[in-house]
C-alpha cells in the first residue's frame, strides 16, 4: 500500500465545508486504489491571524514542507480587511508559494456541456467547446521585481520592475509543453514582445524550449490580442503559457468564460511532484456555515492532486467523471442552479460525487 502525507489548510469562510467534502473523496479514492492518505490539518489565513497573530505560522509552513501535497480551501474575508497589507490573510498565499518554491500555477477552464448556459458568451461561440489550461509563472516578473517611490522633478513617483531570467522562463515553458503532451499538443505563448524587452527574452526562450517538443505546436499572441481571443474564440486554445502579471489577468478572464467560478480548480507546482491545490474562488463568508457552498472546485482540485503529485491519472479521471455524472443527472448547488435542475447543498453534492466513484 502506498502512503502519502497531505497537509490540509481549510482556511476561512466556506473553506472548512468544501475541504471536508474533498477529503471524503480522497479517502474513497485511496480505498479503491490501495493508497493511504494521511491528513494533517493546519491553519493559515484569517483563522491563523485570530489564533496566532500572523497569517502563516511557521508550524504551518514546516508541516507543508514535510508533506507530499497541500490541499487549501480559501483564505480571507472582510473581517480582516482593515489590517495592514503585510498582516492580511492573503499574505499566507504568497508565503506558501515562496516558502514551498511553487513557481507554476495551472488553471484549467472547462465548460461542461450541461453548464453551457452559465457562460456569458454567445451560444455559437460556446458550442465549439472550451477546455483550456493556463500555465502562469508564479514567482518572477513585476510582482517580485524592484519597486519603490521617489521624487522625479519635484513630483511624487512610483515604479515597479518587470524582470525575468532565462532559467525562470525555461522551467515554466517545460511545464506548459509537458502539459500539452497530455492534452491536444498545442501551446500558445502570451507576451508583449512588440514593446517589452522582458517579453522578447520570454519569446526567444520559449522558442528554444519548443525544439525539445517537436510534436507540440507552438504559436504566439500579444497579451492584448490574447485577451480578445479568449472571448472571441476560446475553443482555439489548448495550453496558454504566460508571465505572472499577464497570467493573473488572463486566468480571471478565462474563469468567466465558463461562467461557473465554483467549478474551477488550480494547482501550484515546482520541479518535483509536490504541489498545492485549491479552488480559484474566494472564501465567500456571506454563505459560510449554511451548507450552500459549491464543493466541486475543491473536489476537482483533488483530481489535480491525484494527477500531478501522486501520478494517479486513472484515479483523477474517476473523480472528474464522477463530477460530470452528477452534473448530467441534474444536480446543482445554488451558484450554478437553473430552472428545472435539482438544487442541493454542500454536503449532499459531496455525497452524490462519492456515490459515483
Swiss-Prot record:
Homodimer. Pfam families: Iso_dh (PF00180). This is 3-isopropylmalate dehydrogenase. GO terms for molecular function: 3-isopropylmalate dehydrogenase activity; magnesium ion binding; NAD binding. One of its GO terms (biological process) is L-leucine biosynthetic process. The record marks 143, 192 as: Important for catalysis. GO terms for cellular component: cytosol. Binds 1 Mg(2+) or Mn(2+) ion per subunit.
Amino acid at each position: 500500500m502506498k502512503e502519502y502525507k497531505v497537509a490540509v489548510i481549510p482556511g476561512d469562510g466556506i473553506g472548512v465545508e468544501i475541504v471536508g467534502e474533498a477529503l471524503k473523496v480522497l479517502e474513497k479514492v485511496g480505498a479503491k486504489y490501495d493508497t493511504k492518505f494521511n491528513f494533517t490539518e493546519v491553519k493559515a489565513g484569517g483563522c491563523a491571524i485570530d489564533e496566532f497573530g500572523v497569517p502563516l505560522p511557521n508550524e504551518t509552513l514546516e508541516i507543508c514542507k514535510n508533506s507530499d501535497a497541500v490541499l487549501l480551501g480559501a483564505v480571507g474575508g472582510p473581517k480582516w480587511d482593515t489590517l495592514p497589507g503585510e498582516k492580511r490573510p492573503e499574505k499566507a498565499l504568497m508565503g506558501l508559494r515562496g516558502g514551498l518554491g511553487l513557481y507554476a500555477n495551472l488553471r484549467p477552464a472547462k465548460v461542461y456541456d450541461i453548464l453551457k448556459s452559465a457562460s456569458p458568451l454567445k451560444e455559437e461561440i460556446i458550442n465549439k467547446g472550451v477546455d483550456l489550461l493556463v500555465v502562469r509563472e508564479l514567482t518572477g516578473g513585476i510582482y517580485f521585481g524592484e519597486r519603490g517611490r521617489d521624487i522625479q522633478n519635484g513630483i511624487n513617483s512610483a515604479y515597479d520592475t518587470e524582470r525575468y531570467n532565462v532559467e525562470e522562463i525555461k522551467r515554466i515553458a517545460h511545464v506548459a509543453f509537458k502539459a500539452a503532451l497530455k492534452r491536444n499538443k498545442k501551446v500558445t505563448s502570451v507576451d508583449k514582445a512588440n514593446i517589452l524587452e522582458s517579453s522578447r527574452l520570454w519569446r526567444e526562450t520559449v522558442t528554444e524550449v519548443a525544439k525539445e517538443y517537436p510534436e507540440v505546436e507552438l504559436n504566439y499572441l500579444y497579451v492584448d490580442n490574447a485577451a480578445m481571443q479568449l472571448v472571441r474564440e476560446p475553443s482555439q486554445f489548448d495550453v496558454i503559457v504566460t508571465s505572472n502579471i499577464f497570467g493573473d489577468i488572463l486566468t480571471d478572464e478565462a474563469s468567466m468564460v465558463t461562467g461557473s467560478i465554483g467549478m474551477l480548480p488550480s494547482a501550484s507546482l515546482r520541479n518535483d511532484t509536490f504541489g498545492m491545490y485549491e479552488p480559484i474562488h474566494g472564501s465567500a463568508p456571506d454563505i459560510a456555515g449554511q451548507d450552500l457552498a459549491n464543493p466541486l472546485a475543491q473536489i476537482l482540485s483533488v483530481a489535480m492532486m491525484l494527477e500531478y503529485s501522486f501520478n494517479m491519472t486513472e484515479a483523477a479521471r474517476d473523480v472528474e467523471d464522477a463530477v460530470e455524472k452528477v452534473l448530467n443527472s441534474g444536480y446543482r448547488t445554488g451558484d450554478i442552479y437553473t430552472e428545472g435542475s435539482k438544487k442541493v447543498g454542500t454536503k449532499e453534492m459531496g455525497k452524490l460525487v462519492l456515490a459515483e466513484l
